[in-house]
Structures are given as C-alpha cells and as structure tokens.
C-alpha cells in the first residue's frame, strides 16, 4: 500500500481506503452519498458513490492526528461545504494538522476525488 494511503487503525477497519478515508465494517454498500449535487455545481464533476458508516453517518479523514476539524458530518453537507472530503496533498495536510492549521486540508481536488472513485471501483471488482 502506498504511503499516501491510510493504514488500518485496528482489525475492525474496513479493508478499503481511498482518498485517505477510513471505513469501518459498518459500511453499507447500499447506502451511497454522492457529491454530484445540483446545489453546488462547482463540484458537479465529483461523482459518487461515496459510502459512509451507517451507524454514525460520519467519517474521519485519516490524518496523523484527527480532530474535530477533520470530521465531515452528513447531517449538514451545505454547512460543511465539502471542505474535508478530499485532500489537496496528503502530506501537506498531515503537516498542516501537526501545525494546528487546516489551511492545506480545505481544498477539494479532482485528483483525490477521482482516485477515490477509481479505488472504490477496484475494490468492488475484487469480489
């Protein structure tokens, strides 16, 4: 696994990591959340599906020290403005978290969104 990808935190972590998201065994493949919304045309090229843990409706960016700033809640996607759904650069983001700033984590990029979709499809094809 590339160093740019998250590593499991424990045995319960779902064996799927893309765009540096971690998913637990509670993920339901039938429950998708698509970033392709009519409300925010700026991100209309970021097609889902993105799966989320069914029990919490939240997922954490797997930075070296996750905090409240790196939690995205599906309860209010407009307020969150999708700012933590993908990273501009994983290493920059980790350094930003270490420096107690999320400036480098606030950029949503096609690069990681597309990597997310590709890895998700690859994982599905492994069955």
Swiss-Prot record:
Disruption phenotype: Invasive growth defect with elongated cell morphology. Keywords: Membrane, Vacuole. It is found in: Vacuole membrane. It is a peripheral membrane protein. Present with 4050 molecules/cell in log phase SD medium. Required for viability of cells lacking mtDNA. This is Interacting with cytoskeleton protein 1. The lineage of its organism: Eukaryota, Fungi, Dikarya, Ascomycota, Saccharomycotina.
């Amino acid at each position: 696994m590339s160093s740019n990808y998250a590593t499991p935190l424990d045995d319960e972590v779902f064996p799927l990591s893309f765009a540096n998201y971690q998913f637990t065994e509670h993920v339901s493949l039938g429950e998708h959340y698509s970033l392709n919304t009519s409300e925010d045309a700026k991100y209309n090229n970021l097609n889902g599906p993105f799966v989320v843990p069914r029990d919490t409706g939240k997922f954490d960016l797997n930075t070296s020290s996750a905090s409240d700033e790196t939690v995205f809640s599906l309860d209010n996607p407009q307020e969150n403005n999708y700012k933590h759904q993908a990273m501009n650069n994983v290493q920059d983001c980790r350094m930003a978290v270490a420096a107690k700033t999320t400036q480098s984590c606030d950029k949503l990029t096609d690069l990681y969104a597309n990597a997310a979709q590709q890895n998700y499809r690859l994982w599905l094809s492994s069955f």
